[in-house]
Amino acid sequence: MNDIIRIGTRKSALALIQTQLVADELRQVCPGIQVEIVTKDTLGDRILDKPLQEFGGKGVFVSEFEQAIQEGVIDLAVHSAKDLPMELAEGLTIAAVSGREDPRDVLVTMRGHKIRPESVVRIGTSSPRRQLQAGLMCKTLWPGAAGTECSTLRGNVHTRLRKLEEGNFDCIILAAAGLKRLGLLEQDTYEYTFLNPEEFIPAGGQGLMAVEAKAGTMAHSLTQAMDHAHGRLCLELERRVLKLLDAGCHEPIGIYSVPDNGQLEVWGISSRRGEVKRIHMTGGTSREDMEKLALEAWKGLM
């Protein structure tokens, strides 16, 4: 096969690693295919001094790649699934979903750093979901602390770690999947506290990669061979719940699911109108059962 598949991705080290994983798998399922990686900075990469919810939400990492697919500049785009907006651009589809890397959030501190009794813990995170749960778990995570203070933290993983090193925060919260893919968990500069995803609930799609394509194209057809059934199952349920909730990145909502013996187990958290709600439920994996489960989750989180 002499076809060239052009894959679009952001320029960050993590985005490039994730895209290389997709490119390598595509070469395995389509021997002889040529792959070209096309990089660009998105609006979300260029504006780092504001929370995402102030200038466009999740779509700021995706929309420029969607336009490039529609215009034929690239054939595929690789995204962290949690960055996908609820509505894809016209004619585009999620052609493949990866298997799930570690879905947990991680508290990262400088090695040896201690929280003083009765002090306020300075946390670097722009995520309302992480801010909510860090506050709720303050006494568990930092016994003796007076409370938490969360401040905006944007940029790629290395930028965020540098700001931690500069003393701007007592800790920052990052996704385990990104730290693992970047090989940063081997560094002894930091201490890592992995948070149980059944208690500190991840974002919908966290730990998953999604490959976007124009529906009906050769690239779409080829990429479908890479689709991971369990990853697809979880992403579809989690995105369905988020869509029912009409949730954007400005709302503190976590949703996480795990396939187990033909069932889907799901955990969720939300805070609306000042009331925190949690769910934990199980349902089947047929289309009908998944819709029923999503509706039950929605009702529990509203």
Model features per residue range: what roles?
Residues 81-84, 177-179:
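Short glycine-rich anion-binding loops that position phosphate/pyrophosphate groups of nucleotides
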Residues 81-82, 88-147:
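A conserved helix-loop-strand patch within extracytoplasmic ligand-binding domains
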Residues 2-41, 46-47, 54, 62, ...:
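Small-molecule-sensing regulatory modules
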Residues 44-49, 77, 85-88:
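Short active-site-adjacent helix-start/loop capping segments
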Residues 74-78, 170-171:
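Short, Asp-centered acidic motifs that coordinate Mg2+ and/or phosphate
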Residues 49-76:
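Short, structured active-site "lid" loops
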